[in-house]
């Protein structure tokens, strides 16, 4: 069963996840893309523990297998909503093994620690995961040419 901890506790894994982000999202993080995986991960590992913040999943040997982040803004069509669960990634060999669910649960705990009552997520691919984990779809939008489904979840302490 994976262990989930804040990225700020193991910032040495930023380089590993930067490579994964560049391979998973080449239009954004790859050559010619607008994003910088290393800069985003550096921000997610901030030692103060405020937004943006990321959590990582480690396997039993302590190797990184997944990441998810909580940040202030995500897609430009929904700037009125905040904060956002973003940058969800699980290595291919660990997908469908509940790692994503553990990462989402840890993000909810981080949101609660930071005093948030609701968080949001935009996704094109993780719809079934979010639905299984109790998220509710509230909208849809096209972002960077891709249809995104907008979900929300009440932070448990705020229920």
Segments the model singles out, each with a brief description of its role:
Residues 26-56:
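Active-site rim helix/loop that mediates acceptor-substrate recognition in acyltransferases
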């Amino acid at each position: 069963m994976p262990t989930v901890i804040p990225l700020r506790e193991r910032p040495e894994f930023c380089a590993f996840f930067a490579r994964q982000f560049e391979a998973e999202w080449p239009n954004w993080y790859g050559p010619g893309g607008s994003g910088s995986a290393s800069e985003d991960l550096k921000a997610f590992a901030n030692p103060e523990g405020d937004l943006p913040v990321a959590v990582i999943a480690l396997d039993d040997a302590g190797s990184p297998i997944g990441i998810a982040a909580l940040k202030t803004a995500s897609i430009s069509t929904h700037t009125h909503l905040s904060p956002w669960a973003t940058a969800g990634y699980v290595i291919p060999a660990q997908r469908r093994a509940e790692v994503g669910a553990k990462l989402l649960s840890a993000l909810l705990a981080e949101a609660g620690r930071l005093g948030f009552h609701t968080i949001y997520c935009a996704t094109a691919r993780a719809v079934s995961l979010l639905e299984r984990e109790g998220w509710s779809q509230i909208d849809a939008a096209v972002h960077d040419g891709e249809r995104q489904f907008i979900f929300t979840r009440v932070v448990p302490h705020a229920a």
